[in-house]
């Protein structure tokens, strides 16, 4: 599913970036992929996908 239509970023692309870079904030994620830097309508959905994927990572599961 496309999350950011302006830049053609899908939830899959966000999840891949989270697994690869383990960003600790949405601002960090934006350094790796161009999400939320145009109209901003995707920010909430992109953040939710990022947080969901972070919770799946082993290092975050242990600290939760």
Swiss-Prot record:
Keywords: 2Fe-2S, Electron transport, Iron, Iron-sulfur, Metal-binding, Transport
Protein residues bound to [2Fe-2S] cluster: 4, 6, 39, 42
A Pfam family the protein falls into: Fer2_BFD
Cofactor(s) demanded: [2Fe-2S] cluster
Outcome reported for the amino acid change (mutating residue 57 to M): In strain: ECOR 30
Purpose of the protein: Required for mobilization of iron from the bacterioferritin (BFR) complex.
Taxonomic path: Bacteria, Pseudomonadati, Pseudomonadota, Gammaproteobacteria, Enterobacterales
Subunit structure: Monomer. Interacts with bacterioferritin (BFR). Up to 12 Bfd proteins can bind to the BFR.
Effect noted on mutating residue 63 to I: In strain: ECOR 30
A molecular function (GO) term: 2 iron, 2 sulfur cluster binding
Effect of residue 51 to Q: In strain: ECOR 30
CDD domains cross-referenced by the UniProt entry: Fer2_BFD
Cofactor: how bound: Binds 1 [2Fe-2S] cluster.
Gene this protein is translated from: bfd
Name by which UniProt lists this protein: Bacterioferritin-associated ferredoxin
């Amino acid at each position: 599913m496309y999350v950011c239509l302006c830049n053609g970023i899908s939830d899959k692309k966000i999840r891949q970036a989270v697994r690869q870079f383990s960003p600790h904030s949405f601002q960090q994620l934006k350094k790796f992929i161009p999400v939320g830097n145009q109209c901003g309508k995707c920010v909430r959905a992109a953040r939710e996908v990022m947080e969901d994927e972070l919770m799946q990572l082993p290092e975050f599961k242990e600290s939760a």
